[in-house]
């Protein structure tokens, strides 16, 4: 599951850097961090991982990805303001 998380994080970071306005950035946030976003969908799948070590690793990757995306959003928001 970690490659999927990395892919979703990369897509979100790319979309954030391409956002030209604050409104565009808000759409990116909803698309990637919202309830129906890519990262949220992957997070729901964490419980289905049977191996505790794999689940722990995927959870850590999910946390790191979400943190990176949130930090990038804040940085981009400051740039656009």
Regions found by a protein language model. Name each.
Residues 1-81:
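N-terminal alpha-helical targeting/anchoring segments
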């Amino acid at each position: 599951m970690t490659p999927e998380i990395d892919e979703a994080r990369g897509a979100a970071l790319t979309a954030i850097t391409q956002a030209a306005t604050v409104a565009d950035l808000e759409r990116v946030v909803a698309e990637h961090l919202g309830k129906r976003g890519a990262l949220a969908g992957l997070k729901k799948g964490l419980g289905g991982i049977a191996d505790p070590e794999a689940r722990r690793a995927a959870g850590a990757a999910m946390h790191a990805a979400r943190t990176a995306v949130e930090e990038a959003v804040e940085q981009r928001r400051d740039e656009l303001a």
